Amino acid sequence: MLPSDLVKYKKNSQKIIALTAWDSISGSIAEQANVDLVLVGDSLAMVCLGYKSTLPLTLGNIIYHTNAVSRGFKKNIEEQPLVIADMPFLTYQCGEDKAVEYAGKIIQSTYAKAVKIEGAEPEIQKVISRLIRMGIPVMGHIGLTPQSYLNLGLKKQGESLESQEKIKKEASILEKLGCFSIVLEHIPDLLAKEIQNTLTIPTIGIGAGNYCDGQVRVTADLLGLNDDQPPFCQPIIQGKELFMKKLKEWVESERLN
């Protein structure tokens, strides 16, 4: 699958389903679950590496984990999900030349076929435009942007009219720049619906209601593996409790043998 194929999904009213992955096991599970795309998100900084935010993640980290995810795939290459890698904090906010260099390393060194970039500020717009002109597909990401939490916090975005207009304008700009898709995070359902109806490229929601063209979730959140759950992700299973229960039972049984 290529990034441009996601536009066909929208034209055909076919829902896009995505999960995050961070190693070969989570990559294999996502593939076997028949998702359309796998996002190697910077959330792995917290899920896998134990950091309190996404900010410490490095370029080397994202390359390492993207390769690990791809090694978990078992299907024929044409049946494998599309792999998209997040660009870590300060790998694209450092000027166009450096951003091209770093994004190029991700594409050259992994099986990722696109990168995801947060925000739509004028400086970021220039970077996105340059990357696309250089042949690197870009997925946009607006609404709640976790890499900006030191300034914006982690609260829901788009609740005021001013904020809604800003997000709608950003979505339009990202489409015009050439993004093949946009993640909408933690915004009101009706705002996401309005954006979805306006754009010709697909919107993929996380905490943005059911009107988006697709949905993405952090797999560890969905499986209930994290202590701190985001308000917009209801676990489908309390995985941590289940695993701990079974492991404790095994430990006790082994002690008795």
Curated annotation (Swiss-Prot):
It comes from the Bacteria. It is found in: Cytoplasm. Binds 1 Mg(2+) ion per subunit. The keyword Metal-binding applies. Keywords: Cytoplasm, Magnesium, Metal-binding, Pantothenate biosynthesis, Transferase. Its EC number is 2.1.2.11. CDD domains: KPHMT-like (cd06557). Its cofactor is Mg(2+). 3-methyl-2-oxobutanoate binds at residues 42-43, 86, 116. It catalyses: 3-methyl-2-oxobutanoate + (6R)-5,10-methylene-5,6,7,8-tetrahydrofolate + H2O = 2-dehydropantoate + (6S)-5,6,7,8-tetrahydrofolate. Its main location: cytoplasm. One of its GO terms (cellular component) is cytoplasm. Mg(2+) binds at residues 42, 86, 118. One of its GO terms (molecular function) is magnesium ion binding. The keyword Nucleus does not apply. The active site is at 185 (proton acceptor). Pathway: Cofactor biosynthesis; (R)-pantothenate biosynthesis; (R)-pantoate from 3-methyl-2-oxobutanoate: step 1/2. GO terms for biological process: pantothenate biosynthetic process. NCBIfam families: panB, PRK00311.1. Belongs to the PanB family. Homodecamer; pentamer of dimers. Catalyzes the reversible reaction in which hydroxymethyl group from 5,10-methylenetetrahydrofolate is transferred onto alpha-ketoisovalerate to form ketopantoate. This is 3-methyl-2-oxobutanoate hydroxymethyltransferase. It comes from Prochlorococcus marinus (strain MIT 9215). The gene is panB.
